Amino acid sequence: MNATRKQRLCLVIGVLAAAALAVTLIVFALQRNMSYLFTPSQVRAGAAAGYQQFRLGGMVKAGSIQRAADSLKVSFTVIDKNAATPVEYTGILPDLFRDNQSVIANGRMQGGRFVANEVLAKHDETYMPKELKDAMAEGHLGKPIPATAAPLTTPR
């Protein structure tokens, strides 16, 4: 192998190594910032057990909103077709947050309750992630969900 070919081979190997390193760093960065969406049924089935932080999506159960008198702490229940998950949140809720409203909460499970650090309320009928829309379509078919639609259960 002559010197020119050897130099070209070293250059190609160096470029490939740099590209592999860049792809590896991008994948690790994306994994850290990725937040998976689960419904209460999936949480109860244990699908979210391996995730420290995830998003919980569903409908706010009618009559479940309880506000603390002395703080910004709010408790409510997120339901889907088959399950309910109690949620605690401390902070200012969106103006559109109310009973029978689609909601997505970002947080973690703690002692059988979902502790949210962010709550998003449905902006209008077009705002809903496809995964949540598909999961909720089976349960309520666009109709309001009564307060007794899903029993309050704690995840395993």
UniProtKB/Swiss-Prot annotation:
The keyword Cell membrane applies. Residues 30-156 are periplasmic. Pfam families: CcmE. Disulfide bonds: none annotated. Coiled coil: none annotated. One of its GO terms (cellular component) is plasma membrane. It is a single-pass type II membrane protein. Signal peptide: none annotated. One of its GO terms (molecular function) is metal ion binding. The chain crosses the membrane at residues 9-29. GO terms for biological process: cytochrome complex assembly. Residues 1-8 are cytoplasmic. Keywords: Cell inner membrane, Cell membrane, Cytochrome c-type biogenesis, Heme, Iron, Membrane, Metal-binding, Signal-anchor, Transmembrane, Transmembrane helix. InterPro entries: CcmE, CcmE-like_sf, NA-bd_OB-fold. Heme chaperone required for the biogenesis of c-type cytochromes. Transiently binds heme delivered by CcmC and transfers the heme to apo-cytochromes in a process facilitated by CcmF and CcmH. This is Cytochrome c-type biogenesis protein CcmE 1.
